[in-house]
Amino acid sequence: MNCLRDSGRGLIPAWETLLLTGALLSSCTCSATSKLPQMKGANTQLPVPGALEKDLSTSWFPELEAQPPTSSSPKGLPGRPRTSQEVPNAEDNPSLIPLVTFPESSKGIIYSDLNYSVILQWMVTMNPEPVLSWTFDGKPCGTGEKLFIRRLSPDQLGTYLCIARNTDKELVSEPVTVSLSPATGAPTVPAPTVAYPMKPNDYMSVSGGSAIALIVAATIGGLVLIGSVCFYILLALKK
């Protein structure tokens, strides 16, 4: 009996300890929740120690911080941005103005025959009045509104263009190429003839019966000539 009484008395402090622990936990939880902001839309932020906050700010997604910013092209795609030198401007490269030619050009080519006339003319309007200069294969060949080739020669076959300059700007004409007609073609060089060797003292030689006949005929002819001369001299003396 004494043992049972002693054991019952020893259980009371354990239950009291559990009750006290539960009361302390509930009071701590209520006090923590009461301190949170109650306004609508407010962000709940828990306090973070200074050292931990520094570590998070420096080590959070390091690969994103090391990556350089991506530049975008005009179409919004990632890549190297374009510059003014890469994008041609139509105002800096105006369309070429065609020339007025005689004979008429076909796809930038004038077909003509040698020793015929070729006329090139460029009618351009600029303010102030421009100075027109012509070039032949990149070399200056004349000035003025017209370029007149009186007799076309092989040396004048090539590309011509005109440049107009004034104090404000410079314009370039459409280049034209002067070429021979397809039917005429380039001037042909005569084929070399075969040369036969010849001896320094080579002459027409006669031998045999033909040589004897030639000598006899020459002798008879000489005698007839001398006889006729003597005959006419005698007749003159008799008179």
Swiss-Prot record:
Keywords: Cell membrane, Immunoglobulin domain, Membrane, Transmembrane, Transmembrane helix. It is found in: Cell membrane. The chain crosses the membrane at residues 214-234. Signal peptide: none annotated. Residues 63-93 are annotated as: Disordered. Residues 94-179 form the Ig-like domain. One of its GO terms (cellular component) is plasma membrane. It is a single-pass membrane protein. The keyword Membrane applies. May be involved in osteoclast differentiation. This is Immunoglobulin superfamily member 23. It comes from Mus musculus. The lineage of its organism: Eukaryota, Metazoa, Chordata, Craniata, Vertebrata.
